[in-house]
Each structure stands twice: as C-alpha cells, then as structure tokens.
C-alpha cells in the first residue's frame, strides 16, 4: 500500500515534466559509444553505453553489460562501438521508412585504439579473439 501511495504521489508531482525537442532542421543520425572495462567486480564484465541523436535531439539511449570478458579497454570500447553501429543501422532503416534518408552515419568513440581497429579490422594477435 505504501508503494502504491508513492507511485501516485510521484505521478501527481511530475505531470508537468516532459521532453523538449528543438525544431532543428539537421536530421543527421549519430551515436556516441562508451564502455567501462571490467566494471563489474563479481564477473569482470564491462558495461557498454550508447546515446543516439537525430540532429541535436537525443532520441534513444542504452546501457548493457557485455556478454564476454574484455582483456583491455580497447576491446571493451570496440565491442561497445560495434553495438552502437548495429543500433544506428536499425535506426537508419526506421528513418528511411519515414522518408528521412541517411547516407552517412557517425559513431563517436573516445578510444583511439578502438577507432584504429575499426578503420583497419585486420586480425592481429591482440585482436583476433574479439567477437562482436
């Protein structure tokens, strides 16, 4: 009963809250990806986080524990960028269904080595075990 009262109070006090989207004519789809390395002390798995924008408006975000244990920050960031790419491709398809065509998708990643691997995905001894 106490939980129900809290929910009703929350809904009542937040009825004026909302999300504001600008009338930005920029319809460029972009994604920001980040990951922490071995952030979970119990199983040493990393967590990926992604934010997706159309123009200047945030339209989606996600946070997910990665399925595998990364051996480095580069691997964790590369896996996060791959997940971000997958989501962006789905969003590109969805926007295309609404008549908004995207020719280029941009992914922002803060790890130089992960960016270099994505530009040249040749299997090196340090990267051949990575599965996305």
Can you name each region flagged by the protein language model?
Residues 1-132:
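Divalent metal-binding acidic/histidine catalytic loops
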């Amino acid at each position: 009963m106490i939980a129900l009262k809290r929910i009703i109070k929350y809904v009542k006090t937040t009825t004026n809250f909302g999300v504001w989207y600008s009338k930005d004519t920029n319809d460029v789809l972009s994604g920001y990806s980040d990951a922490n390395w071995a952030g979970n002390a119990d199983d040493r798995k990393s967590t990926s986080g992604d934010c997706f924008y159309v123009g200047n408006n945030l339209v989606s975000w996600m946070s997910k524990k990665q399925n595998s244990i990364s051996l480095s920050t580069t691997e964790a960031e590369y896996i996060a960028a791959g997940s971000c790419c997958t989501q962006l491709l789905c969003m590109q398809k969805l926007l295309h269904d609404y008549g908004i065509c995207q020719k280029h998708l941009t992914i922002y990643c803060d790890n130089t080595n992960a960016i270099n691997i994505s530009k040249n995905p040749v299997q090196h001894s340090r990267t051949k075990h990575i599965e996305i």
